[in-house]
Curated annotation (Swiss-Prot):
It comes from Staphylococcus aureus (strain JH9). The gene is ligA. Residues 586-667 form the BRCT domain. This is DNA ligase. Transmembrane segments: none annotated. It catalyses: NAD(+) + (deoxyribonucleotide)n-3'-hydroxyl + 5'-phospho-(deoxyribonucleotide)m = (deoxyribonucleotide)n+m + AMP + beta-nicotinamide D-nucleotide. SUPFAM superfamilies: BRCT domain (SSF52113), DNA ligase/mRNA capping enzyme, catalytic domain (SSF56091), Nucleic acid-binding proteins (SSF50249), RuvA domain 2-like (SSF47781). Zn(2+) binds at C401, C404, C419, C424.
């Protein structure tokens, strides 16, 4: 058995080496047949001697048993998006803002890979969990599929606990092979490598994912505590040493002109790459400076994504159709002769409003220029008057709603026409779609087509009716088998337990967004207390402006809305805030109410763990030192934050002092 154990270890080493050469370096030293022969030898050994199968075995790359569904998991820290820059002016404004806050700066420029963001968690050096970005707060667990990607190490070169983030993508070579195979089988082709990568990672059968030959570039570490890195560039070098694949086409530059030169280089050379990129990511390189700048609610202040100019194509405008949103806004949509734009076929594009149509002199029958805004949303940029046919038709918006026939109005200060009929069918359907959306009640399986069927069948007329649906209601619907019905009813039941902020946002109160819904839910705790609130009270709340206050009070005073809320209560839909009320956290006086900054490397816990513990004691953890900071906890190699705290006379604790205070509380 000792000989067999040695052979297993030898096979691991050889297969990992050959895999790295093929998938990462693109320079294989042995033919595919040799790799396959060794892999099958290892598979046979593991089948006959299961005790030799390890969690990091190369056979894991083949894929395992199919899953029933993907589990949703909360990210330890949110996967934020980046702010966008579309031109030189945007970049220079970003640079000016950076220099005004932190002075001299070095930037790290990296290629923006056009793929799917993923988060990879390692415990004691082993890959244990991989998530999609999802909505930034919650992602899907696609661990088994990610294990099939050879560029992802199943075991790091050091036994660290770490979470890294990167972009999974499909190389162009793999994409062409996949579509050739689909074409042979008379299957629908993927529009572009990004869609193919996303579809491949969401396969319930990881064996199918394994066949798609995906890859990944790692671009960040969630917690730098265990890294001897002072900068983004050093962190990427550390990741390379640990066995991760980072993109080597990166560059450190000393100023914004260097950034612009890097962008110019890769704008002209992007087609020479074996994978798609859709822009350039620019980051402040120094990690202390990143900490000093901090984050907005949606994105880091120290980074920005430059998006390549959108591809423009010419096609014919066949017609203009209207759609009505949940707030009654009537939006014109261009119906186009199908055309390829940025890798996908486009037959519809936004025209925004009537003023834009007239300002750009866009007529039905015109040749028009179409692009994708941010490479995502198709829009008509302009018409080409010199190619206009004689029978081109000037478009005029209707005076009445195409859905309900109610007269359309233009509210003062707005460019959009609006239907103000509260019983307009189109608005009601859009409101239902919003109610079940991810950031609202998040009811999986209740998509647009099912909502439309339910509404047309008069099974639902308002959002409360969703909670009255039965198996008998759902089974007759198109493409609704028993399993789908069971899953949908379970999702509806689960949605009853959502916190109050989800319900508030889902109700679609005009001007009330996700953040304001959270603020109101936390402050008033129950829907009953909110029903008694006045406009004067609301405007006193930070983050709630005049428009929101007026809209909320007007909405909740409506008798039909109060009846709707009662209807929801009758089905036991939760009306209470379930989150932690930050103002009510009863922490120790040593921490409660204090503003605390963490800086430097901590050895006895991660910075994330320290932040969570401080928050549990009622402290506010911030990323930058100001005159309002109460305490700075300084770990090893604390930099500019420590210096600033000393100059401001702020109380400073060492890591050991902080740990001692924790131990005092726990004793």
């Amino acid at each position: 058995m000792a000989d067999l154990s040695s052979r297993v270890n030898e096979l691991h080493d050889l297969l990992n080496q050959y895999s790295y050469e093929y998938y990462v370096e693109d320079n294989p030293s042995v033919p595919d047949s040799e790799y396959d022969k060794l892999l099958h030898e290892l598979i046979k050994i593991e089948e006959e001697h299961p005790e030799y199968k390890t969690v990091d075995s190369p056979t894991v790359r083949v894929g395992g048993e199919a899953q029933a569904s993907f589990k949703k998991v909360n990210h330890d820290t949110p996967m934020l998006s980046l702010g966008n820059a579309f031109n030189e002016d945007d970049l220079r404004k970003f640079d000016q803002r950076i220099r005004e806050q932190i002075g001299n700066v070095e930037y790290m420029c990296e290629l923006k890979i056009d793929g799917l963001a993923v988060s990879l968690k390692y415990v004691d050096g082993y890959f244990v969990q991989g998530l999609t970005r999802g909505d930034g707060t919650t992602g899907e667990d696609i661990t088994e599929n990610l294990k099939t990607i050879h560029a992802i190490p199943l075991k790091m070169k050091e036994p660290l606990n770490v979470e890294v983030r990167g972009e999974a993508y499909m190389p162009r070579r793999s994409f062409l092979r996949l579509n050739e195979e689909k074409e042979k089988n008379d299957e629908q082709l993927f529009a572009n490598p990004r869609n193919a990568a996303a579809g491949s990672l969401r396969q319930l059968d990881s064996k199918l994912t394994a066949k798609r030959k995906l890859s990944v570039f790692i671009y960040s570490v969630n917690d730098f505590t265990d890294f001897n890195a002072r900068s983004q560039s050093e962190a990427l070098d550390e990741l390379d040493k640990l066995g991760f694949t980072t993109n080597k086409n990166r560059a450190r530059v000393n100023n914004i002109d260097g950034v612009l030169e890097y962008i110019e280089k890769w704008t002209s050379q992007r087609e020479s790459l074996p994978y798609d990129i859709d822009g350039i990511v620019i980051k402040v390189n120094d990690l202390d400076q990143q900490d000093e700048m901090g984050f907005t609610q949606k994105s880091p202040r120290w980074a920005i994504a430059y998006k390549f100019p959108a591809e423009e194509v010419v096609t014919k405008l066949l017609d203009i159709e209207l759609s009505i949103g949940r707030t009654g806004v009537v939006t014109p949509t261009a119906i186009l002769e199908p055309v390829k734009v940025a890798g996908t076929t486009v037959s519809r594009a936004s025209l925004h409003n009537e003023d834009l149509i007239h300002d750009r002199d866009i007529r039905i029958g015109d040749s028009v220029v179409v692009k994708k805004a941010g490479d995502i949303i198709p829009e008509v940029v302009r018409s080409i008057p010199e190619r206009r046919p004689e029978d081109a038709v000037t478009y005029h918006m209707p005076t009445h709603c195409p859905s309900c026939g109610h007269e359309l109005v233009r509210i003062e200060g707005e460019v959009a026409l609006r239907c103000i009929n509260p019983k307009c069918q189109a608005q009601l359907v859009e409101g239902l779609i919003h109610f079940v959306s991810r950031q609202a009640m998040n009811i999986d399986g209740l998509g647009t087509k099912i909502i439309q069927q339910l509404y047309q069948s008069e099974l639902i007329k308002d959002v409360a009716d969703i909670f009255y649906l039965t198996e008998e209601d759902l089974l007759p619907l198109d493409r609704m088998g028993q399993k789908k019905v069971d899953n949908l009813l379970a999702a509806i039941q689960q949605a009853k337990d959502n916190s109050l902020e989800n319900l508030l946002f889902g109700l679609g109160i005009r001007h009330l967004g996700v953040k304001a819904s959270q603020v109101l839910a936390e402050k008033y705790e129950t829907i009953d207390r909110l029903l008694t609130v006045t406009e004067a009270e609301l405007v006193e709340i930070h983050d709630i402006g005049d428009k929101v206050a007026q809209s909320v009070v007007t909405y909740l005073e409506n008798e039909d809305i109060r009846a709707l809320i009662q209807k929801l209560k009758d089905k036991h839909v939760n009306m209470i805030y379930k989150g932690i009320k930050t103002s009510d956290i009863e922490g120790h006086p040593e921490f409660s109410g204090k503003t605390i900054v963490l800086t430097g490397k901590l050895h006895q816990m991660t910075r994330n763990e320290a932040s969570k513990w401080l928050a549990s004691q009622g402290a506010k953890v911030t990323s930058s030192v100001t005159k309002n900071t109460d305490v700075v906890i300084a770990g090893e190699d604390a930099g500019s934050k420590l210096t600033k705290a000393q100059s401001l006379g702020i109380e400073i604790w060492t890591e050991q002092q902080f740990v001692d205070k924790q131990n005092e509380l726990n004793s």
